[in-house]
From Swiss-Prot:
The keyword RNA-binding does not apply. Its EC number is 1.1.1.267. Catalyzes the NADPH-dependent rearrangement and reduction of 1-deoxy-D-xylulose-5-phosphate (DXP) to 2-C-methyl-D-erythritol 4-phosphate (MEP). The gene is dxr. It comes from Desulfosudis oleivorans (strain DSM 6200 / JCM 39069 / Hxd3). The lineage of its organism: Bacteria, Pseudomonadati, Thermodesulfobacteriota, Desulfobacteria, Desulfobacterales. SUPFAM superfamilies: 1-deoxy-D-xylulose-5-phosphate reductoisomerase, C-terminal domain, Glyceraldehyde-3-phosphate dehydrogenase-like, C-terminal domain, NAD(P)-binding Rossmann-fold domains. This is 1-deoxy-D-xylulose 5-phosphate reductoisomerase.
Length: 383
């Protein structure tokens, strides 16, 4: 029985993780559920999975959760980052699923690694912000980091049984998002409703907007750079609208390996939870004859400048990826609040990056300072 702490239990990845846990309740149990808010959903999860601990963002939310739990509930309720870090460090926990959105997941994920827990990583911002620090700490502690992102799971699977010294290139696939065939003018004036309507995946609001700008793919480039220890120039993005091939790797002999599956996050989640084994999800493999054709083409950086900004930050290293991430979070939040138009998102990020002086070999404190500076600066650029 593998015992789990789930960071971000009420989000899309969290909900799908609990579906996998429910299906394989003889193999997994839940020790702690952690969320920001979404009290009603979290209360339902607590009553269903009976964890020893539930953690939310602050004291009022904790009180609201307690009021929704039945009298005599065995689940302790804590709040704040200290609560999240306690949840990942519980002695009985074998694996932490890191699925919090954004920078909020960094501290708890580092705490999990320090506690020697295996980490199933869905929060790409953890590596975007502090990739070198996190990977070095994981190596020091002997802690496996298993990717949940479908693309990084695909790369991880394609690398199995192969010596990485023979790797030539990583090919990250992108669906192209809801604006794949839209003009630049149509993209710049898009509404939140239009940007949230992803053609392939059902996701949370923030990652849906990142998918619409292609910033999500840019963050995945940076994540891949650290997770697989390859330079930015060894990673390329290719648009693949069918989302059947989740990523590919090519080797120095000209061969290429790809991982295919129907678009369903439960596959990547189950693989991370059960690695090196595989679970029978009762999910059919892609019907190649029915697909008829799979298409690929290069992304248009003129219409989707966020991807180019992410590659730039990845190449510049230092604290630029952390600044990119922070400025993006602020700009996306402003767009969702309808404070800025969609086309303003990359311009805010570009200006913040242009004003930043990168810190070489940054400490965790340097990264947090850069994150805070970028949020303040991006906020100052908003109406």
């Amino acid at each position: 029985m593998k015992r789990l702490t789930l960071l971000g239990s009420t989000g899309s990845i969290g909900v799908n993780t609990l579906k996998v846990v429910s299906r394989f309740c003889d193999r997994f149990s839940v020790e702690a559920l952690c969320a920001r808010g979404s009290v009603d959903t979290l209360a339902e999860q607590v009553q269903r999975f009976s964890p020893s601990l539930a953690v939310v963002i602050d004291a009022p939310t904790a009180q609201a959760l307690k009021e929704r739990l039945p009298a005599g509930s065995r689940t302790e309720v804590l709040f704040g980052e200290a609560g999240y870090c306690h949840a990942v460090s519980l002695p009985g926990v074998d694996m932490v699923v890191s699925a919090m959105v954004g920078a909020a997941g960094l501290g708890p994920t580092i705490a999990a690694i320090k506690a020697g827990k295996a980490v199933a990583l869905a929060n790409k911002e953890v590596l975007v912000m502090a990739g070198e620090t996190v990977m070095a700490l994981a190596a020091q502690k002997g802690v496996p980091l298993l990717p949940i992102d479908s693309e990084h799971s695909a790369i991880f699977q394609c690398l199995q049984g192969n010596d990485k010294t023979f790797l030539s290139k990583i090919h990250l696939t992108a669906s192209g998002g809801p604006f794949l065939n839209k003009t630049r003018q149509e993209i710049e004036t898009a509404t939140p409703e239009q940007a949230l309507a992803h053609p392939t995946w059902t996701m949370g609001k923030k990652i849906s907007i990142d998918s619409a700008t292609l910033m999500n793919k840019g963050l995945e480039v940076i994540e891949a750079r650290f997770l697989f220890d390859v330079p930015a120039d060894c990673i390329e993005v290719v648009v693949h609208p069918q989302s059947i091939i989740h990523s590919m790797v090519s080797y120095i002999d000209g061969s290429m390996m790809a991982q295919l599956s129907v678009p369903d996050m439960k596959g990547a989640i189950a693989y991370a939870l059960s690695y090196p084994e595989r679970l029978d999800l009762n999910q059919p493999a892609p019907d190649l004859a029915a697909l008829e054709q799979l298409t690929f083409f290069s992304p248009d950086l003129d219409r989707f400048p966020c991807l180019g900004l992410a590659f730039e930050a990845c190449r510049r290293k230092k604290t630029f990826p952390a600044v990119l991430n922070a400025a993006n979070e602020v700009a996306v939040d402003a767009f969702l609040r309808e404070a800025i138009p969609f086309g303003r998102i990359p311009r805010v990020i570009e200006q913040v990056l242009a004003e930043h002086t990168g810190v070489t070999d940054p400490s965790l404190s340097d990264i947090k300072d850069a994150d805070a500076w970028a949020r303040q600066r991006a906020g100052a650029l908003l109406p």
